Design a protein with these regions (language model features):
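Short, solvent-exposed loop/turn segments at conserved positions within beta-propeller repeat blades
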Residues: 78-84, 136-141, 201-206
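Bacterial N-terminal signal peptides
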Residues: 13-21
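Terminal domain-start segments
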Residues: 28-108, 209, 214-217
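Blade-terminus and WD-like Trp-Asp/Gly-His loop motifs, strongest in beta-propeller folds
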Residues: 51-63, 69, 116-124, 177-186
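Short glycine/acidic-enriched loop and turn motifs that connect beta-strands
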Residues: 71-76, 131-135, 193-197
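Extracellular-facing segments of soluble proteins and assemblies that are Gly/Ser/Thr-biased and enriched
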Residues: 105-147
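Bacterial N-terminal signal peptides that target proteins for export
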Residues: 2-13
Length: 225
């Protein structure tokens, strides 16, 4: 190798070393796929990219787990930004997992995912996906989804339409997926939303109430205690 070639190779290696040393590290932490962020600590001083993986949910319908990534970045003014992405991995036999669901947040938008377990029949996996804004001007939006082990497809449950039929159109409420009922209905807890001064709120839920969503009829009914 000539001296010129050797110098060029050395420059390339030094450049690669610099890039690798300055690239943000991806810190893996526990199973917090529901609310993973780029910040940690009381003063939010620990700012970096992070990754989380849920435990594997197992049933006769297959195996599934979720991953969440919070990607940290800064602009020229050193302002901090965080963007999330979540994925659901599924396998029939525990081998060769494939991504069957993926959702990426917009700039400075968080996305989380909860794996709530398989139905009693082992054919459907219940999930909850949440989207929020890191600038705090965006409301937290939650969606319930189900993975069908027969088709391998993930579909959103039409809970908004079902609650509109029960509670009415102009109704504000906070909802959270509880899990599966004994009859493989999906249990949803609704309650009052946090107060805000950004708009006039219309409440129709006085106290936390659990509803059962029938997967076949797409209807809601109050769940027995």
């Amino acid at each position: 190798m000539s001296d010129r070639s050797a110098r060029s190779a050395t420059k390339i290696m030094l450049c690669l070393a610099f890039v690798l040393s300055t690239a943000p590290r991806l810190i893996c932490q526990g199973g917090n796929t529901a609310s993973l962020t780029c910040w940690e600590g009381k003063d939010r001083s620990n700012f970096q990219s992070r990754k989380a993986k849920s435990p594997t949910a197992k049933a006769s319908g297959g195996f599934a787990y979720a991953e969440a990534v919070a990607e940290a970045s800064k602009d020229m003014g050193d302002a901090q930004f965080c963007k999330n992405k979540v994925q659901l991995f599924y396998s029939k036999d525990g081998n060769d997992y494939k991504v069957v669901y993926e959702k990426s947040g917009l700039e400075d938008q968080g996305v989380g995912i909860r794996v709530l377990g398989w139905s009693h029949t082992g054919t459907q996996l219940l999930l909850e996906v949440a989207v929020w804004g890191y600038d705090r001007d965006m409301d937290l939006v939650k969606s319930a989804l189900a993975l069908d082990s027969v088709t391998g497809e993930v579909k959103e449950l039409p809970l908004s339409d079902a609650f509109e039929r029960v509670l009415g159109k102009d109704c504000e409420y906070d909802s959270s997926v509880v899990g599966w009922g004994n009859d493989d209905s999906v249990l949803i807890r609704v309650g009052k939303t946090p107060p805000t001064t950004r708009y006039n709120q219309t409440f129709c839920v006085d106290k936390p109430t659990v509803y059962a969503f029938n997967m076949r009829s797409r209807s809601l009914a109050r769940s027995s205690p």
